[in-house]
Regions:
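Short, well-ordered alpha-helical microsegments
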Residues: 128-129, 193-194, 217
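Short amphipathic alpha-helix with an adjacent loop that forms part of the alpha/beta core around
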Residues: 169-179
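Adenosine-phosphate binding glycine-rich loop
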Residues: 210-275
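Short, structured coil segments at secondary-structure junctions
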Residues: 158-160, 203-204
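ADP-ribose/adenylate-binding Rossmann-like module
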Residues: 145, 182, 187-190, 198-223
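Short amphipathic alpha-helical segments
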Residues: 132-134, 156-157, 176-177, 195-199, ...
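Segments forming oxygen-rich coordination pockets for charged ligands
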Residues: 1-147, 151, 155, 161-164, ...
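Conserved SAM/SAH-binding loop
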Residues: 166-171, 191
Length: 275
């Protein structure tokens, strides 16, 4: 009843009564996600009667035959390419297609499916552990790096998908850093922070944040500029001190402020409000 809806709106729910009929699409989607490849799930909905519809799904980068006119399939492919090029995870689209000889329009839904974005945390101490937990809640694939096995282990880091025990700077140097990569540096000291930060300078990472006092950050800024490790523009792209200003005091509060900043950057809503 629309009058009883809290939001005051109306929602239509599509229930797939025979999901096994589209298992090939689901398998191809799973394979794509495991391989780290984005794709689009295409769903064709054909009215059957007043309350039922016929559903056919395909994974757009796999075998996709929706039994539609050729020009309409070409239109769908163009829409799929547009979604993938945009990289927008919320770019859901609906197409209404007229079929010759049919009165009802065929609806086609396009749902982008992207692999999880990657959160790399340099440092497995108290803050790294808390940020790992927050990152997992936000849907990131979480990798934590530390050279201390007593910290870099599954007992201390139960939320981490990947735990790397080795030199922090070398590990970050070798890991891919693209626009779906978010890097948080929370190591145990100045030299380790510098080692972790240097490979991030000039990378394509969507976000690089480093924890530290304003005094420490100022000293590192001076060092990086003086040694030619970063330009002023590159340094200014780093979120340091890390996190959004919410008066954080405890480790957990600091992790929440960092998580909030990650959300802000992931949503492409402009630079952090951290001053």
């Amino acid at each position: 009843n629309p009058e009883e809806a809290v939001c005051g709106g109306i929602i239509t729910i599509l229930v797939d009564g025979d999901p096994l009929a589209n298992m090939q699409a689901y398998r191809e989607m799973e394979q794509g996600i495991r391989a780290g490849q984005p794709g689009v799930l295409v769903t064709r909905v054909v009215p059957w009667n007043d309350t039922q519809v016929l559903i056919k799904r395909c994974w757009a980068t796999g075998h996709c035959d929706l039994q539609l006119p050729g020009n309409e399939m070409q239109r769908i492919k163009q829409e799929v390419n547009s979604i993938l090029l945009s990289g927008n995870r919320s770019d859901y689209r609906q197409l209404d297609i007229a079929i010759p000889g049919e009165q009802e329009m065929v609806k086609v839904f396009l749902e982008p499916v992207f692999p999880p974005q990657h959160l790399i945390i340099a440092g497995a101490g108290h803050v790294g552990r808390a940020v790992s937990h927050q990152g997992k809640l936000l849907g990131f694939e979480v990798t934590v790096i530390d050279d201390r096995v007593e910290y870099a282990n599954s007992i201390n880091l139960p939320d981490a998908d990947n735990i790397v025990v080795r030199d922090i700077g070398q590990a970050i140097q070798e890991l891919p850093k693209d626009r779906d990569t978010y890097i948080v540096i929370v190591t145990r000291g100045h030299s380790h922070d510098a080692d972790a930060l240097r490979p991030c300078i000039g990378s394509q990472a969507a976000y690089v944040g480093m924890m530290g006092s304003r005094i420490k950050v100022a000293k590192m800024h001076e060092e990086f500029i003086a040694k030619g490790w970063a330009t002023e523009e590159q340094w200014n792209s780093i979120c340091t001190p890390v996190g959004i200003e919410i008066g954080s005091v405890t480790v957990e509060e600091i992790a929440v402020s960092i998580a909030a900043q990650l959300i802000k950057y992931r949503g492409n809503r402009g630079p952090s409000v951290k001053k």
